């Protein structure tokens, strides 16, 4: 075993020990295949009012512009599939937001992984990324062999489905690189057929400006009336395309205590949601990603669903 293989194996083993679901590594270079796709997606205004998607176009496609002398992209996934879910007949929030804000949880684990690399390998330059910088997470995870990008544009695996977060360490260390896996979507169109707002405009292409997650989280203005009655009771985010995916039959509950829901969340009825106060909002969602939409945003969403 050469040094690169040894270092790669050490990093992967520690990632799993820290609770990550999987870890893969790819060479830090320009994403040639993704460049024209991203350009076309932006040109067709599929980012809606997410102006930040238009910024740092070059950096999104080349990690060497984000990290000096970048050699490797270490991609990691962290399971968030819950053991318990909201009851039927109430307003719904995406399962990723049940527990503590994933940014904070994952950053803590990435910091530990960086410290491990420094201790075991030596001084390694790099940066950690958790859905908060111009990095194409899913593209790097796919290049690293962690899964394939499904027709709903989420990363998929045969063994664990798609309910997991993706994070990266971009480092100036040469490592052994993994290979992409085969696409196993086949002729299935379950996600396309089930999308309440027809946001999956063709296989592998999601029009972000039509997605319920966009309307309930990203959009700051009023939700267009043309979508009234099409939200299937989703008040924050939407999991429909993942819920109907056959590969998610194999999703297993996470083992991260911080992702467990607030005790009051699962028992909220529609009436509770409609009468929610700012105090209750702060109590239940103080540490959740739901706080991103703020109390006023959640109220707007619920009013739209009534």
UniProtKB/Swiss-Prot annotation:
It is found in: Cytoplasm. It catalyses: epoxyqueuosine(34) in tRNA + AH2 = queuosine(34) in tRNA + A + H2O. Its EC number is 1.17.99.6. [4Fe-4S] cluster 2 binds at residues 195, 211, 238, 241. Binds 2 [4Fe-4S] clusters per monomer. One of its GO terms (biological process) is queuosine biosynthetic process. Keywords: 4Fe-4S, Cytoplasm, Iron, Iron-sulfur, Metal-binding, Oxidoreductase, Queuosine biosynthesis, tRNA processing. The active site is at residue 131. [4Fe-4S] cluster 1 binds at residues 185, 188, 191, 245. Pfam families: Fer4_16, QueG_DUF1730. Its cofactor is cob(II)alamin; [4Fe-4S] cluster. Pathway: tRNA modification; tRNA-queuosine biosynthesis. PANTHER family: EPOXYQUEUOSINE REDUCTASE. HAMAP family: QueG. Catalyzes the conversion of epoxyqueuosine (oQ) to queuosine (Q), which is a hypermodified base found in the wobble positions of tRNA(Asp), tRNA(Asn), tRNA(His) and tRNA(Tyr). This is Epoxyqueuosine reductase. It comes from Cellulophaga algicola (strain DSM 14237 / IC166 / ACAM 630). The lineage of its organism: Bacteria, Pseudomonadati, Bacteroidota, Flavobacteriia, Flavobacteriales.
């Amino acid at each position: 075993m050469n040094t690169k293989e040894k270092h790669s194996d050490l990093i992967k083993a520690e990632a799993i020990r820290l609770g990550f679901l999987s870890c893969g590594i790819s060479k830090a270079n320009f994403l040639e295949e993704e460049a024209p796709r991203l350009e076309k997606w932006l040109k067709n205004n599929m980012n809606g009012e997410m102006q930040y998607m238009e910024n740092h176009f070059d950096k999104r496609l080349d990690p060497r512009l984000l990290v000096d002398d970048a050699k490797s992209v270490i991609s990691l996934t962290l399971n968030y599939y819950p053991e318990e879910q909201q009851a039927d007949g109430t307003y719904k929030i995406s399962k990723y937001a049940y527990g503590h804000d994933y940014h904070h949880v994952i950053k803590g684990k990435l910091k530990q992984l960086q410290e491990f690399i420094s201790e075991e390998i030596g001084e390694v330059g790099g940066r950690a990324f958790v859905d908060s910088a111009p990095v194409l997470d899913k593209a790097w995870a796919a290049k690293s062999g962690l899964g394939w990008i499904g027709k709903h544009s989420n990363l998929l695996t045969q063994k664990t489905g798609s309910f997991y977060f993706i994070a990266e360490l971009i480092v100036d260390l040469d490592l052994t690189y993994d290979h992409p896996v085969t696409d196993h979507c086949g002729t299935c169109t379950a996600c396309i057929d089930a999308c309440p707002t027809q946001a999956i405009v063709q296989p592998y292409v999601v029009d972000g400006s039509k997605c319920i997650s966009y309307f309930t989280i990203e959009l700051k203005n009023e939700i267009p009336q043309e979508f009234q009655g099409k939200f299937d009771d989703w008040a924050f985010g939407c999991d429909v395309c993942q819920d109907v995916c056959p590969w998610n039959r194999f999703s297993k509950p996470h083992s991260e205590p911080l992702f467990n829901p607030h005790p009051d969340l699962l028992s909220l009825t529609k009436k509770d949601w409609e009468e929610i106060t700012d105090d209750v909002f702060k109590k239940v969602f103080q540490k959740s990603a739901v706080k991103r939409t703020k109390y006023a945003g959640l109220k707007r969403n619920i009013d739209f669903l009534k």
